[in-house]
Amino acid sequence: MPKVREIAQVCKSKNAGPFEVTIDVVFADKAMFERVKKTGVLSAELMARLYHVPADDILFTVYDAGLAFKATLPRRIPAGDVGDTDVYGAQQHAPLLEVDIPV
């Protein structure tokens, strides 16, 4: 079963302001995007499990025109605050890379 890192063209994260991070998973072709979408694996519920936040606090969007999935979720620590280890939010996508997708 392939992992997100093996089938997505892009998997990245970044700050969406000081209190949220956004994660994008983008596919190179429509066929693979549709196969992944059909599995339902990439979801707010998955993000909630991976990032330990309630699913209700996650804004999850399937962006058909961009062949992408996008999740915006609250940061545990505000960007740049004491204890923040990723001030730009650029490493937050890492747990998603190892998710198996049954395509």
Regions found by a protein language model. Give the residues of each.
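Long, contiguous binding/interaction regions
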Residues: 1-103
